[in-house]
């Protein structure tokens, strides 16, 4: 179904069965598959392929040569009807690739709201990208990676499969991330190691001085005290009890499956 207010360039192909919402603009030489849904106000510039069981929300802008919903690169994939789900108000720049999920997970690759995926960024099968995230040019997420809200992944950075990048993390460019990065941390290098907390980013997002002091104290316990994780957990839990901003930092320990960067 194509809404009457949608504008589709005559050189583009929209297969029967696709759902195109109100005010959608599809530029020249795009291909939209039969199982695709595109929400109102979304713009596809030109030369874009949206394939598979893919849902794109409202008011997104997708730039030329992006590929969304194509078959993933997992060798076990056998053509199962897995999906891509993208939220609202995302900017997906030139040559970005977002692949559909696998049945080995829940079958869905997810991108939330208000994200910026810069040129050549890659979101592999079963990844979950939260809200307000930035993937800079050529940032690459392997399969099953989780990127929490407000995280920034620098250009030319690769994140190993099954890693989790915590909220408000900043990963510097040209890094290789092979373990989980706790919330609020700056990580850099190959393999990535911690370089303090993302102070500027947290200030911009309205964290109070008291909260920043508490987050810094938790960071120092984890990374500078010389103690083991089991030894510092009770101390960080005490800080989190008094300062709720530290709770995501503490909770991340239980979420981690690949171990924390060190």
Curated annotation (Swiss-Prot):
Enzyme Commission designation: 2.3.1.129
Keyword ATP-binding: no
Protein's UniProt keywords contain Coiled coil: no
Keywords: Acyltransferase, Cytoplasm, Lipid A biosynthesis, Lipid biosynthesis, Lipid metabolism, Repeat, Transferase
Pathway where this protein functions: Glycolipid biosynthesis; lipid IV(A) biosynthesis; lipid IV(A) from (3R)-3-hydroxytetradecanoyl-[acyl-carrier-protein] and UDP-N-acetyl-alpha-D-glucosamine: step 1/6
UniProt record, GO biological process: lipid A biosynthetic process
Enzyme class: transferase
Name of one Pfam family that matches: Hexapep
Xref: InterPro entries: Acetyltransf_C, Acetyltransf_C_sf, Hexapep, Hexapep_transf_CS, Lipid_A_LpxA, Trimer_LpxA-like_sf
GO cellular component labels: cytoplasm; membrane
Entry's localization field: Cytoplasm
Catalyzed reaction equations: a (3R)-hydroxyacyl-[ACP] + UDP-N-acetyl-alpha-D-glucosamine = a UDP-3-O-[(3R)-3-hydroxyacyl]-N-acetyl-alpha-D-glucosamine + holo-[ACP]
GO MF entries: acyl-[acyl-carrier-protein]-UDP-N-acetylglucosamine O-acyltransferase activity
Family: Belongs to the transferase hexapeptide repeat family. LpxA subfamily.
Function (record text): Involved in the biosynthesis of lipid A, a phosphorylated glycolipid that anchors the lipopolysaccharide to the outer membrane of the cell.
NCBIfam families for this protein: lipid_A_lpxA, PRK05289.1
Quaternary data: Homotrimer.
Stated name of the protein: Acyl-[acyl-carrier-protein]--UDP-N-acetylglucosamine O-acyltransferase
